[in-house]
Amino acid sequence: MGRISEFVCPSCNMSWEARLGHGMGHAALGSVLEEFPPDIQQKILADTEGEQYPAFEFNYCPAVCWQCQKVVAVPVIYLHQAGQTYTAACPDCGNSIAVQTEDGEILCPHCGKENLTVEEIGRWD
């Protein structure tokens, strides 16, 4: 089950909600592929070709889009056998994003003055 996190800037009071983690529907590679654009889907399929049961880790991770100036959730997959990690672009503008660790500090993408606070506000599946 995934979690819903709220990111808040103590300086400018901007806030963002992000659905992080993964749901029960993300257990099979076929359903996870749908979360990525076609070019990344092809890379994932090429990297897992020949594997009967591909081993992978999938999660929606927090990321900062400096173009949109906000926090977004992006799909990230790690393929164990290939040792490859693939991350989708910003879901709003398509730009490359900077994936963040949830326990790390995230500078406010709106004002750039303070680190965001993070609070879990719900669950999703």
Where are the language model's segments positioned?
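His-enriched metal-coordination microenvironments in redox/metal-binding proteins
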Residues: 1-6, 123-125
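Short Cys/His-rich micro-motifs in 6-15 aa windows
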Residues: 71-73, 111-121
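Short recognition patches in nucleic-acid-associated and regulatory proteins
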Residues: 14-59, 73-79, 86-99
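Short cysteine-rich clusters marking metal-coordination/redox-active sites
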Residues: 9-12, 65-68, 90-93, 108-111
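A short local loop/turn or secondary-structure capping micro-motif enriched for an aromatic residue
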Residues: 24-27, 105-108, 124-125
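Beta-strand-rich cores of mature extracytoplasmic or soluble domains
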Residues: 62, 66, 71-74
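Residues immediately within or flanking Cys/His clusters that coordinate Zn2+
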Residues: 4-6, 58-62, 84-87, 105
